[in-house]
Design a protein with these regions (language model features):
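Glycine-rich phosphate-binding segment of PLP-dependent enzymes
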Residues: 1
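A common structural junction motif
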Residues: 165-166, 257-269, 321-329
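Short, flexible turn/loop "capping" segments at secondary-structure junctions
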Residues: 138, 172-174, 231-234, 295-299
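Conserved small-domain helix->loop->beta segment predominantly found in fold-type I
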Residues: 199-273, 287-293
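FAD-binding core of FAD-dependent oxidoreductases
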Residues: 135-141, 176, 267-280
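Conserved PLP-enzyme active-site core in the AAT-like
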Residues: 4-213
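Short, well-ordered beta-strand elements within core beta-sheets of diverse protein domains
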Residues: 180-189, 237-245, 303-307
Length: 329
């Protein structure tokens, strides 16, 4: 799927991420990372990796000049998400690849938010990571991760003497692997529907005057970059965010939508039902509030993982009723 020579599965997405970073970095090495990434990855790089002498500079991944300025002679890894969690910033993977090659560092891309829609390896990434838990499995009933890369890297990860994937123990069991493989066979169908539904909701929410962020909207700052990188038939992905002003309104809306069976208030994504959460107090809660504000988080931010609803117009009209009911519209 990602076009790499081989891959290695793990017991979780974080099992894949941490193994790669520990394999690529030694004590004294340096990482340049996007500042808007999954909270668990941020916590690992910010709080855990320094225990081993690995330090990280967090930068605006959309600012290529700032990224290049952050690179030092100790930098070994440039890390980003193809579409960031949860602010949906889009990485210019071709531009990042040029920088990585210029300084002989590894470009590692987490592609969890955009499987099939974006192919990081084709665009120049050295290593591609997924949380299999999300879109690829698609049914929120198991946990897994995968590292896709060159044979040499995967062999090193599996080495019984010094391989991080082997020695840290985050191995996937065979039953989980078989279950995910079964669901993988419908990913191409599911991603088209996720993208179709997300695009519809994004346009409707925007037309209603709600602050909406979705890479498929021309108003998105990186719309052109995503469009230039995408595999067109799979669309712009199933993730979008809206800002309803306050956390109280966000919680009231999510609770009412769940009550009306429009989806679930949950921190995962890629499920066949729509999932919604307030990232600042959930998936990004590891990031201090002052840093969240610097990154562009707001209290009223709601992240939607749009489901596979057959009648998305009906879903939207029901969501709009909920928004009117709680005073958002």
């Amino acid at each position: 799927m990602e076009g790499t020579v081989t891959s290695n599965v793990s017991a979780s997405g974080m099992g894949a991420i941490t193994a790669v970073l520990m394999q690529l970095c030694n004590a004294g090495d340096h990482v340049v990372s996007s500042r808007t990434i999954y909270g668990g990855t941020y916590a690992f790089l910010k709080n855990f990796a320094p225990k081993f002498g690995i330090n990280t500079a967090f930068v605006d991944i959309t600012n290529l000049a700032a990224i290049e300025d952050a690179i030092t002679e100790k930098t070994t890894v440039l890390y980003c998400e193809s579409v960031s969690n949860p602010l949906l910033e889009v990485a210019d993977i071709r531009g990042l690849s040029k920088i990585a090659k210029k300084y002989n560092i590894q470009l590692v891309v987490d592609n969890t938010f955009s499987p099939l829609s974006i192919s990081p390896k084709v665009l120049g990434a050295d290593i591609v990571i997924h949380s299999l838990t999300k879109f690829i499995n698609g049914s929120s009933d198991t946990i897994g991760g995968v590292v896709c890369g060159r044979q040499e890297l995967i062999d090193h990860l599996r080495n019984v003497n010094d391989g991080a994937a082997m020695l840290l123990g985050a191995s996937m069991d065979s039953l989980r692997a078989a279950s995910i493989l079964k669901n993988l066979r419908t990913l191409h169908i599911r991603m088209k529907q996720h993208s179709h539904n997300a695009m519809y909701l994004a346009h409707q929410f925007k037309n209603d005057g709600i602050k909406t962020v979705y890479p498929g909207l021309e108003s998105h700052p990186s719309h052109a970059i995503f469009k230039n990188q995408m595999n067109e038939e799979y669309g712009f992905g199933g993730m979008l965010t809206i800002d309803v002003g306050t956390l109280d309104k966000a919680n009231a809306l999510m609770e009412l939508m769940q009550k009306e069976n429009l989806g679930y208030l949950a921190v995962s994504l890629g499920f066949y039902k729509t999932l919604f959460s307030a990232p600042g107090s959930s998936t990004s809660s590891e990031i201090p509030e002052d840093e969240q504000k610097e990154m562009g988080f707001s209290e009223g931010l709601i992240r939607f993982s749009v489901g596979l609803d057959n009648d998305i117009k009906r879903t939207y009209l029901s969501m709009k009723k909920c928004m009117v009911s709680v005073g958002i519209l």
